[in-house]
Curated annotation (Swiss-Prot):
GO terms for biological process: cell wall organization; cellulose biosynthetic process; root hair elongation. The keyword Transferase applies. Keywords: Cell wall biogenesis/degradation, Glycosyltransferase, Golgi apparatus, Membrane, Transferase, Transmembrane, Transmembrane helix. Expressed in young seedlings, primarily in the vascular tissue. Expressed in the root cap. Gene3D superfamilies: Spore Coat Polysaccharide Biosynthesis Protein SpsA, Chain A. The gene is CSLB5. GO terms for cellular component: Golgi membrane. Belongs to the glycosyltransferase 2 family. Plant cellulose synthase-like B subfamily. InterPro entries: Cellulose_synth (IPR005150), Nucleotide-diphossugar_trans (IPR029044). This is Cellulose synthase-like protein B5. SUPFAM superfamilies: Nucleotide-diphospho-sugar transferases.
Length: 757
């Protein structure tokens, strides 16, 4: 409850980041793009079909920049004031935390354990928290790991709170050696904690290779004769906070769940697991707010829950319409600098409109909104209107929407009416929780239209569109240090496959019933917010990106002109130079190096001509009914923690492990053929150009192709440098012969086509 007599200082404040200088730069680049288009239109009759292709590509790039400029026009973010929250709010609301995992091979249990430990140790009343771990692979190893983690957290959570530890994921905290200190008690506790964590890691590692413990413990009987895609519902209360005394009261509820899966039933991948988490948590604790994080995304800021509550508890009409609070994804490894920059720019941009997208992790949701409420269903005081009461709370409507579980229906009514459930023993609710996990439970209900949305492998964007279409807003908080930090796949197939899934899911959203296109005719989504979701269509840029990467080579081989001659060439030079300097400044302003900027520019081109290109193929095959789109789990890893007796060079607490920046891993997947083909074509064109220069240093030939086109080829080769390096590397960093031979065959065909014309 808030103290009305306290200061009127807000719990959070929306800060605008408008910059007239950046607006001027954006508009200047846009003006240069359209001046180039105008030049091509005026001179199109003097040139061949190459100019038509160039005009098409540059029109697409201009449209993308126009939309991006609109989205960046009024950037903003919410700044929470935790001290004000601590002063004014004495009875904090409850929170249910969701951690989904699905594959113990690609998502190691110790990764999930670290995420869970970081959540259980946040600075928030333990009796107000509950952590639910969904295991879609029904692995006894995951359950075993959580049982061991529940023992460790009883000493870990008190240790973190006693010494105000900031990074509460043990693997990350213990990467650094013990700093010399005069506090002998802390040193003793630190060494003891690290020993216990190393023991925990060894137990999980030993259990991975030896399953004898499965037969020795009756608690694992439910896992006998189970398969990842064929098993019954399992709900296990790993730890229940019953108050108690001492350190035990510092540990929130911890529940393991695995929904029923059968081969002949749709299970909707991660989206179905999230809806099961929503139902089970509604039955057991029914907190008004939920948090979901991926199993590798640990809480890096112990006050993150309080930061989100500053937005939800802000006493204003506008905050009553905030459906979710989204924190940006930040990573400690690999190639994801481009995500950090994109989220910083696009996240703040849409925060100034209707709010950021839900990005699938690091997000706090309002339970009532996930149950299907629209913003118009609420009165100014936050209560449900009479019209909405008749619509939502009628008995037949409740069963039709939420299923035939009486216990769940009652919990839904309580959540919609903002009633707190009386505390019950979690063990007494296991049977009801198992019921809502049956694979047929959602049949002929509204699940998938409420909760997390189905019909797309990108459940985050799909759900986000549905929420904004109902008139809700969302909040963007980007604290320093980051609230959540995770790992990503290494550069190569894992990264490209992940980007392919994201791109495919984004395009799916634009063709299903939650499409922002439909929001033009119904729904309460703002125009610029629709443009933000149309940004998902940038995946379609793969076609003009591919064409534009080949055009300079085509012109050199065909002896024709791609770029204007004389003074008009300055437009393109200015445009390219200005865009490069602008993007470089954006990277460096966020603390990234020039090398990181170059790697990201290269990666964008590789993703555009591989992941995005194949995502279009996936969508076409789905629309034709030829194949369905699967959900591919990216493999995640964390650095190994050494024992307390092993030494390591000292590094600051904020240091993070760095992978080989820009080092690309290849295999025989067809995803690498386009990039290899582009690189070989441009090398062939440059070789032909050099031969022609030797033969005639004074003439470029009839069409006038020359230095500008050669510079274009050099730029493309620089952007696809990982593929050039792959020709000379060994092992996993080398392009396989099968991929190279296919790309070489396509290159020969392309060269003959150009020369023949």
């Amino acid at each position: 409850m808030a103290d009305s007599s306290s200061s009127l200082h807000p719990l959070c404040e929306r800060i605008s980041h408008k910059s007239y200088v950046l607006r001027a730069v954006d508009l200047t680049i846009l003006g240069l793009l359209y001046s180039l288009l105008l030049y091509r239109i005026l001179h199109i009759s003097e040139n061949d079909n190459v100019w038509l292709l160039a005009f098409f590509c540059e029109s697409c790039f201009s449209l993308v920049w126009l939309i991006f400029t609109c989205l960046k026009w009024s950037p903003a973010e919410d700044i929470p004031y935790i001290n004000t929250l601590n002063e004014r709010v004495h009875d904090l609301p409850s929170l249910d935390m969701f951690v989904p995992t699905a594959d113990t091979v690609r998502e190691s249990p110790i990764i999930t354990v670290n995420t869970v430990l970081s959540l259980l140790a946040v600075n928030y009343p333990a009796n107000k928290l509950a952590c639910y771990v969904s295991d879609d692979g029904c692995s006894p190893l995951t359950y075993f790991s959580l049982k061991e983690a529940s023992k460790f957290v009883k000493i870990w959570a008190p240790f973190c709170k006693k010494y105000n530890v900031r990074v509460r994921a043990p693997f990350r905290y213990f990467l650094n050696p013990l700093v010399a200190t005069d506090d002998s008690v802390f040193s003793k506790d630190w060494k003891m904690m690290k020993r216990e964590y190393v023991k925990l890691c060894r137990k999980v590692e030993d259990a991975t290779g030896d399953s004898h413990w499965l037969d020795a413990d009756d608690d694992f009987e439910a896992f006998s004769n189970t398969k990842p895609n064929d098993h019954s519902t399992i709900v296990k209360v790993v730890w229940e906070n019953k108050g108690g005394v001492g350190d035990e009261k510092e540990v929130p509820h911890l529940v393991y769940i695995s929904r029923e899966k059968r081969p002949n039933y749709l299970h909707h991948y991660k989206t179905g697991a999230m809806n099961f988490l929503l139902r089970v948590s509604g039955l057991m604790t029914n907190a008004p707010y939920t948090l979901n994080v991926d199993c590798d995304m640990y809480a890096n800021e112990p006050d993150v829950v309080r930061q989100a509550m500053c937005v939800f508890l802000q006493n204003s009409k506008n905050s009553n319409h905030c459906a979710f609070v989204q924190f940006p994804q930040k990573f400690y490894d690999s190639y994801t600098n481009e995500l950090a920059v994109l989220q910083s720019i696009l996240g703040r941009g849409v925060a100034g409109i209707q709010g950021p997208f839900y990005i699938g992790t690091g997000c706090f949701h309002t339970r009532r909104v996930m149950y299907g409420l629209s913003s118009d269903d609420l009165e100014d005081n936050g209560n449900i209107s009479q019209v909405a009461t008749r619509e939502f709370l009628a008995e037949d409507s409740l069963v039709r929407k939420y299923g035939n579980s009486k216990e769940l229906v009652k919990s839904v009514v309580d959540a919609l009416q903002r009633k707190s459930n009386p505390q019950k023993s979690l063990a007494n609710l296991i049977e009801a929780a198992q019921e809502v996990g049956h694979c047929h439970y959602e049949y002929q209900t509204s699940w998938g239209n409420l909760g997390w949305m189905y019909d797309s492998v990108a459940e985050d964007i799909n759900t986000s569109v549905g929420i904004h279409l109902r008139g809700w807003t969302s909040s963007f908080i980007s604290p320093d240090p980051p609230a959540f930090i995770g790992s990503t796949p290494t550069l190569g197939l894992e990264a490209i496959v992940q980007q392919r899934r994201w791109a495919t899911g984004a395009i799916e959203v634009l063709f299903n019933k939650q499409s922002p296109f439909m929001g033009m005719f119904h729904g309460k989504i703002k125009f610029r917010q629709r443009l933000a979701y149309f940004w998902a269509l940038m995946c379609l840029r793969s076609i003009p990106e591919l064409i534009y990467c080949l055009l300079p080579a085509y012109c050199l081989l065909h002896d024709s002109a791609l770029f204007p001659k004389g003074p008009c060439l300055c437009t393109i030079v200015t445009l390219v130079g200005m865009h490069c300097l602008y993007s470089l400044w954006q990277f460096m302003s966020l603390g990234f190096s020039v090398q990181s900027w170059y790697v990201v520019q290269s990666l964008w081109r590789i993703i555009a001509t591989s992941s995005w290109l194949f995502s279009i193929q996936d969508i076409i095959l789905k629309l034709l009914g030829i194949s369905q789109i699967g959900f591919v789990i990216a493999k995640k890893t964390i650095p190994e923690t050494k024992s307390v007796y092993e030494s390591k060079p000292s590094q600051g607490e904020d240091d993070v492990p760095k992978l080989n920046l820009g080092k690309f891993e290849f295999d025989s997947s067809g995803l690498f053929i386009p990039g290899t083909f582009i690189m070989l074509v441009n090398l062939a064109a440059l070789a032909g150009y050099l031969v022609r220069l030797q033969r005639s240093s004074c003439s470029h030939g009839g069409g006038g192709s020359g230095l500008a086109e050669a510079c274009g080829c050099i730029l493309v080769v620089m952007l696809f440098l990982p593929f050039l390096k792959g020709l000379f590397e060994h092992g996993k960093y080398s392009i396989p012969l099968s991929t190279l031979s296919k790309a070489a065959f396509l290159t020969v065909l392309f060269v003959f086509f150009c020369v023949g014309k």
